[in-house]
Swiss-Prot record:
Belongs to the ribonuclease III family. NCBIfam families: RNaseIII. It comes from the Bacteria. The active site is at D44, E116. Transmembrane segments: none annotated. InterPro entries: dsRBD_dom, RNase_III, RNase_III_dom, RNase_III_sf. This is Ribonuclease 3. Mg(2+) binds at E40, D113, E116. Residues 154-223 form the DRBM domain.
Length: 224
């Protein structure tokens, strides 16, 4: 048995039904007939509502489109994995030896899913309002500055607006290579403009590498 009491202290919530928490921590590789996927589904919906309601009140004058971008910047695998890491969640997940040897305890997807499952489990046991308190505390701790300019770094859109306006060209993003083990895959992206390479970047996902390349291009153009 893992020391789940330590995790409960980090969550500031003690489960009445310990089996519910164990269920939320059980990856499908450990036991296919008993895993956290259904709780993950529930937790995803709960977090979507929690963050949506929070942003609705915090940014009372912002348009729907801006609120949607903010929510997307918070409700995603990368953000949830960051929160999960702050809880050392990887230490508590039940998974197969094969998955663990493949870096499963550090995989953002597994960490994110487990966090969602825990939120779903708390919701089942304690209700929405209590779960909202815990979820917002975790979010605000890991993202102390919930600000559109900080969270929404859409360099690709900004670059495209500039290049289309000035030269009538749309930047193209080409995958140069993908390398590294599955749990630490890296992607190298080249940003092409009018047939010439303007910038290049490497990151853990294609989207992130594209944004990084766009940022480099904007810096070269003096637009940042």
């Amino acid at each position: 048995m893992k020391n789940i009491e330590k995790l409960e202290r980090s969550l500031t919530y003690e489960f009445k039904d310990k089996n519910l928490l164990i269920h939320a921590l059980t990856h499908k590789s450990f036991k296919k007939s008993y895993n956290n996927e259904r709780l993950e589904f529930l937790g995803d919906a709960v977090l979507d509502l929690v963050v949506g309601e929070y942003l609705f009140h915090k940014f009372a004058k912002d348009a729907e489109g801006d609120l949607s971008k903010l929510r997307a910047a918070l409700v995603n695998e990368k953000s949830f994995a960051k929160i999960a890491n702050s809880l050392n969640l990887g230490d508590f997940i039940f998974m197969s030896v094969a998955e663990e040897n493949n870096g499963g305890r550090e995989k953002p997807s597994i960490l994110s899913d487990a966090l969602e499952a825990i939120i779903g489990a708390i919701h089942l046991e304690a209700g929405f309002e209590f779960t909202k308190t815990i979820a917002l505390r975790l979010i605000e701790k890991n993202f102390p500055q919930i600000d559109a300019k900080i969270l929404i770094k859409d360099y690709k859109t900004k670059l495209q607006e500039i290049t289309q306006g000035k030269i009538g060209q749309t930047p193209q993003y080409e995958t140069v290579r993908a390398f590294g083990p599955d749990h630490l895959k890296q992607f190298e992206i080249a940003l092409m403009l009018d047939g010439k390479e303007l910038a290049r970047a490497i990151a853990g996902s294609k989207k992130e590498a594209q944004q990084m390349a766009a940022k480099i291009a904007l810096e070269k153009l003096g637009a940042l």
